Regions:
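C-terminal structural segment of proteins
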Residues: 1-252
């Protein structure tokens, strides 16, 4: 709740924090907890089903043709889980550094290096050990005075107390009528939060207009490998990126 109300963090992170969970949960929740939460995949959560992350040989989602809310469309082999953190994309756009203390002492972990690809028997999606604790997260400035414009966008089924089906955060550094620098991160579409270099390339160095935002959305789904039950997320990604880019551009 303090992050959602703080003027010290970018508006995109405030928006993401304000939409997470419920007011009661936000009062008790932490940024580190949101980043390190485990997947919501039903096969992982229910021990009556096999799960690669629990040490079984298969990921049932791969063969399940039903619509999947908690599965991704990128990097979804051998495990198709989607990372549920609602604040991770916004933190990613700020070139964050995660500060950790553990049995080996203190260390700083670049945000992009925090994440670990799924492995058989590995429950965590981060490189942190069981004894590690996130003490704080350091964000690079995204000041409007320096030309930065940021936005967060997510698509979900319910307006409150729900996880996003797809989320996107955007940071644009604007010079004149063009984007000089861009950072586009996606959530809920892969086992870890991912950065979309293709969407960034569609924006940087080009005059901005409504078509440019749509082009970024199209570029964002390049390389996707959706399963039968997650193809719908392709369009959600296109829409979320287009909305986030347009929203960021409209801010000064």
């Amino acid at each position: 709740s303090r992050i959602a109300a703080s003027d010290l963090v970018p508006s995109s992170l405030r928006e993401a924090a304000e939409q997470a969970a419920s007011r009661q949960i936000r009062h008790l929740a932490t940024l580190g907890g949101n980043l390190c939460q485990h997947t919501r995949c039903g096969y992982y959560r229910l021990r009556s089903f096999p799960s690669l992350k629990r040490g079984d040989d298969t990921c049932p989602v791969q063969a399940d043709g039903a619509v999947q809310e908690t599965a991704g469309i990128f990097e979804n082999r051998p495990c198709a889980c989607a990372h549920p953190s609602s604040v991770a994309p916004s933190i990613g756009t700020c070139d964050a550094t995660v500060h950790v203390v553990g049995a080996e002492g203190e260390r700083a972990v670049p945000f992009a290096a925090l994440w670990a690809a799924p492995e058989k028997g590995r429950a965590s999606d981060t490189v942190l050990a069981a004894t590690d604790v996130i003490t704080h997260v350091e964000l690079a400035a995204r000041d409007a005075a320096a030309g930065w414009r940021v936005a967060h966008e997510e698509i979900r089924q319910k307006a409150a107390f729900d996880w996003p089906l797809v989320s996107c955060a955007v940071a644009l550094r604007v010079e004149g009528d063009a984007v000089a620098e861009a950072s586009v991160w996606l959530g809920a579409v892969a086992p870890t939060p991912i950065r979309s270099g293709a969407a960034e390339a569609a924006l940087v160095g080009k005059p901005f207009d409504a078509k440019r935002a749509a082009s970024a959305g199209e570029a964002a789904v390049e390389g996707a490998t959706p399963l039968a039950g997650t193809r719908y997320k392709l369009q959600l990604v296109r829409v979320a990126v287009r909305r986030a880019v347009a929203k960021a551009w409209g801010r000064s």
